[in-house]
Amino acid sequence: MIGAIIGAAVGVLTVVSARLIRGERWLYSLGLLTLPSLYAFFALQAGEQAVAVKEMIYGLPYVVAGLVFAFVSVRQSAVVVGIFWLLHGLYDLVHSQFITNTGVPGWYPIFCFVVDAVVGSYLLWLSRRVPDANLRRA
């Protein structure tokens, strides 16, 4: 429960920070890079290099999307990036069914799910308020 509450706070702080630094054009897209990287980091902390590689392979779509949408102006990018955040939240909930990563703290999946849900939901809301739902115009 505390992981969900802290996750909600971190999600809101992420949105507020992006707005304060006027980073909505790039922050959410580049944030996609961190999602698989954290799981890989947990694996490395546990001394499981092969698991870290697997985490990054599974996370390649997030890395590619993050890089593309951070630097390229694309219509509906707020929607696509928001969906990627929401999909990662769902992945957090089922992650242990795909990969055994002993380095992942027990509190992390629900924490990350809530952060991802807050950020993804905000991006879908934002998509209706910026021209062409283009993050580069936010």
What is each of the regions a protein language model found here?
Residues 8-12, 64-72, 114-125:
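Hydrophobic cores of alpha-helical transmembrane segments in multi-pass inner/ER membrane proteins
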